[in-house]
Amino acid sequence: METDNKYARPVYIPYSGTVLLEMSLLNKGSAFSEEERTHLNLHGLVPQTIETIEEQAERVYSQYRLLKADIDKHVYLRNLQDTNETLFYHLVVNHLTEMMPIIYTPVVGEACEHFSEIYRASRGLFISYPNKDRIDEMLRNVTKQKVKVIVVTDGERILGLGDQGIGGMGIPIGKLSLYTACGGISPAYTLPVVLDVGTNNQALLNDPLYMGWRQPRITGKEYEDFVDAFVQAVKRRWPDVLLQFEDFAQKNASPILKRYRDEICSFNDDIQGTAAVTVGCLIAASRANGGRLRDQRVVFLGAGSAGCGIAEQIIAEMKHEGLSDEQARQRVFMVDRFGLLTDKMPNLLEFQSPLVQKTETLAGWEVTNDEISLLDTVRNAKPTILIGVSAQPGLFTEEVIRTMQSHCEHPIVMPLSNPTSRVEATPADILRWTDGKALVATGSPFMPVHMNDQIYPIAQCNNSYIFPGIGLGVLACGARRVTDSMLMAASSALADCSPLAQNGKGALLPELSQIEKVSRTIAFAVAKAAQADEVAVKVSDEELLSLIDKNYWYPKYRSYKHASS
């Protein structure tokens, strides 16, 4: 197999001695062979015993398990990542279910809040507004020559925690860790970026340890021009890169995506990735209930960019299954803090307007006041699906859930808000209120629920099921853009991997232990869709599978030879 041959071949490097040991992408620590220690000037710089990566992993895992607090575990793993990336990924891949919540949600939220306190070593690129005229220079300072995936944030809407300034860098770092651990994209090809445009978080501005630009956030044309300067510089440095926008505030997220999605290969994971994984989960849940997505009625709590992005993707899938645009939109109801979105509601955002309900269609509804509440909407719309993206805990009350089940025996309930402290309802409560009949998926990880002598596995509707496969597919086929069809293909491929939909039992989504298979399946579907949309060169299925193999990186040590030898 080509992959095996690749790892058997030596890599010629110009580094040696302490310089080599300080390079996390190349460092092997105690695993350097006798020959490598001689030719790379490492004798005396590492302990005498030569270890395998498995022996090293046993040691670091033992150290990891001694730590009690999740944030301490996060800091430990980040330090390992900055020291020896191959060992880090070997450890994470072999303990993915245990460690994903530590390196990403929910613990990454706490790491972002305390970023300046726990900061130890530089990773990624910090592009601050005062240096707006030096962006090309800063990109040239990146030592990685073949960057293929960038995740960028401005730190304004970090999970459900709001403005974290440059602390938002924790999100691109964590996200790219999952591109590698779940999608096999080499860490040598990834770059996390934070656009430091100031912060409106007064606690950070007052914090003497805060490491970002201590000014209120720039806005308007200043902000737009700065983002554009970054994107244009990226296009000059790495014109074929996949650029993922992450955790931008809703007032900026949709406009940025709309502006650049046809200019550079890019997508917004909060809008499109969240939508794709949610739709995949909903297709599977609909199949498990004996129907299709086009048959469902959907109520959202939360009408921001993420919620509206999911809604639009649901509508696209309903249309794909045969409904007209009008029919599909009549089946989706958006509720925000001011109530149900209607055509009479003032001050709607641009992306909300297509999702309003016409007032005349609500004439027969029985409501408690002028603002149509979530409970009013559930009572009158009679949804089969309830989705929470509000970041407001506890709003899926017992009354709401029981009202929903009164007209739908097996309601599909998805409290997707992150982190766990922001979830609209816990799976245990939802299952208790529905006597175990609800199908539940969450945004943050939850343990299985034990009730009535049964165990209910809880699917985590996590974007990590989608974006690594999208990235792998884009890299494998060389896609020039990320199209809507590619995202729909990802959703459909994910649904095909659902144990519950396929076998009638288990969780809505496969276990994380199956993530490589899932990512490869999604990558193939995404690449085929890219070819159909003519944004990638058409090749045979066999060649495409070979390209996916070629692009899939495993955390294995390579043997080194000095470039001068």
UniProtKB/Swiss-Prot annotation:
Gene Ontology BP terms: malate metabolic process
Cofactor: how and how many bound: Divalent metal cations. Prefers magnesium or manganese.
Catalyzed reaction equations: (S)-malate + NAD(+) = pyruvate + CO2 + NADH; oxaloacetate + H(+) = pyruvate + CO2
Alphabetized SUPFAM superfamilies for the sequence: Aminoacid dehydrogenase-like, N-terminal domain, NAD(P)-binding Rossmann-fold domains
Keyword Metal-binding attached: yes
Residues that coordinate or bind a divalent metal cation: 246-247, 270
Active site: 104 (proton donor), 175 (proton acceptor)
Alphabetically ordered keywords of this record: Metal-binding, NAD, Oxidoreductase
Amino acids binding NAD(+): 157, 270, 418
InterPro entries linked: Aminoacid_DH-like_N_sf, Malic_enzyme_CS, Malic_N_dom, Malic_N_dom_sf, Malic_NAD-bd, Malic_OxRdtase, NAD(P)-bd_dom_sf, NAD_malic_enz_proteobac
Domain of life, per lineage: Bacteria
Site, as annotated: Important for activity: 270
Cofactor(s) needed by this chain: Mg(2+); Mn(2+)
GO molecular function term, any single one: NAD binding
GO cellular component: cytosol
EC number: 1.1.1.38
Record note on quaternary structure: Homotetramer.
Family: Belongs to the malic enzymes family.
Stored HAMAP family: NAD_malic_enz
Protein name from the UniProt record: NAD-dependent malic enzyme
